[in-house]
From Swiss-Prot:
Its main location: Golgi. It is a multi-pass membrane protein. This is Rhomboid-type serine protease 2. Its EC number is 3.4.21.105. It catalyses: Cleaves type-1 transmembrane domains using a catalytic dyad composed of serine and histidine that are contributed by different transmembrane domains. GO terms for molecular function: serine-type endopeptidase activity. Belongs to the peptidase S54 family.
Amino acid sequence: MDWKSMLRTGVHKPGALTAGLSVFLTLVYVLNWVFPINEKILLDPGALRKLQLTRLSLYPLAHLSIFHLLLNLMSLFVPLSMFEASHGTVFTGITLNLLAIVTGVVYCLVGMLLYPNVYVGGASGWCFTLCGYFAVQEAGFRPHYELASLKMPTLYIPLVFLVLVTLLMPGSSFVGHLIGLGLGYLIGFRERWLQMATPPGWLIVKIETWLDRWISMIPSVVKYHRESSVDRTAGYTPLYQESELPLHNDNFPGQGRVLGP
């Protein structure tokens, strides 16, 4: 499965978790206009010391502006749907929660020393984690991408995005994004560690069996990826097939490739 086919209506339905999370993030943002939700879930560097578990796990749901929300939704939708399709809906949900907690803990440990009064929120940490993860997977097939005479190592492309986001949006959390990206690289290189930190597949299958009645009620416009239908050991399919990559130029003696989508 490639990312472009997911954007073609009717070819691949978005994952149930991906679609549901997009709706839920939007709902939380709207409800925050009426109820002070963000005040309760924004990540405070002192949350770890105060054992505020709500802040440590729910801060990705908080968004400070409509631009912040839309940017994260657009950045998250395709890579998360790809990850969900290859790893399963429940497994992906557990992974997101685990990533939020680990990122939050590391952010607090650093923040208590460097920025004790800086609160953060938003799903951009997940975006950078997925970006790092897929960069590692893609680099195994294509170590470099070329644009004109510029050759960019595939593994470094997320770092370029990180720098650009930091420069264009100076109010964003560089440390939070860096932690998220680092976790993405870690999962990409050591995905077995993620498997060890999550419930075994047989348990997820059992839970899905218990919840089968409710799972069957999920609208058909999205796809629920059951644990029994995914194979997390299957090989990765690169974003671009080799036949899609060449960009010929009579004035350029080599072969060019598009950078990114």
